[in-house]
A protein has these predicted regions:
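Conserved catalytic core of sirtuin-type NAD+-dependent deacylases
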Residues: 1-261
Length: 261
């Protein structure tokens, strides 16, 4: 009934949402080292490469990391859960607040006015030297050359304004140069100004608790919150009774069956 009768719904999606589409979470350090031996040799962890420091000091490796991720996302497809969310949004006023940068919600056909990619998107670029606060779309695959043996990139994309090197339009670790997406931010603020009937928290982790705190705030103001996560400990912050210990894809398929079939 919560889903079927919902008038205003907020989806709070994190890494666990896209994991079923073969998008790595990089939480498993051993798995990360296995996938990228050259990074292990230099002791470059994922958060080291996802930083402005890497783009200034380890540029070939930094762009290789993101080029690999762009190609991986391009080779995979949004899973059934994304389609189900889009179908639900045809029945209610909905919005997606995602910490994911893989662009899968938009690839699945999500309305561009109904999403805030709060950490940015790997499918947009901005100037590494911040010659302007503008950003631009670039969905080219490949975007630059990539040597998978050495995990070094070359022929980097350039800024369309000053011809310097471009970087992903993503909020990285230790990043004071991310230009943000004001339009998406305004759309989210406008949505959240009115009461929300149901918030669904998906695949969040304690490492990036952005969505957890939004869910907690909404729950304290009377919004029903469903938490979908394979990790039972993920419910410690929100502590909702509506906890579903399942993968994101499987949970949405089951919830859709219960609500509408």
């Amino acid at each position: 009934d919560l889903i079927r009768n919902c008038k205003r719904m907020l989806l709070l999606t994190s890494a666990g949402m896209s994991a079923d589409s073969n998008i790595p979470t990089f939480r498993d350090k051993d798995g990360y080292w296995k996938n990228f031996p050259p990074f292990k040799e230099k002791n470059l962890e994922a958060q080291d490469l996802a930083s402005p420091w890497a783009f200034r000091n380890e540029l070939p490796h930094a762009w290789a990391f993101y080029e690999w991720r762009r190609r991986n996302a391009n080779d995979n497809q949004p899973h059934e859960g994304y389609r189900i969310i889009n179908e639900w949004f045809k029945k209610c006023d909905g919005f997606i607040h995602t910490t994911n940068t893989d662009g899968l919600h938009l690839m699945s056909g999500c309305d561009r006015d109904r999403i805030l990619e709060v950490h940015g998107s790997m499918w947009r670029l901005q100037c590494l030297d911040t010659c302007t606060h503008q950003y631009w779309d670039d969905v080219s695959v490949p975007l630059c050359d990539l040597d998978n043996e050495t995990m070094r990139a070359s022929n980097f994309p350039g800024c369309i304004h000053c011809r310097s090197i471009a970087r992903p339009h993503i909020l990285m670790f230790g990043d004071g140069e991310y230009t943000g997406h004001p339009e998406q931010g305004i759309n989210f603020r406008n949505f959240i100004e009115k009461s929300v009937d149901l918030a669904i928290l998906v695949g969040s982790s304690g490492a990036v608790p952005t969505n957890d705190y939004i869910a907690l705030h909404l729950m304290e103001s009377g919004t029903e919150v469903i938490n979908i996560n394979l990790d039972a400990s993920s419910n410690q912050i929100v502590n909702t009774d509506l906890f579903i210990e399942m993968k994101g894809k499987d949970a949405f398929v089951e919830l859709n069956r219960i609500a509408f079939e």
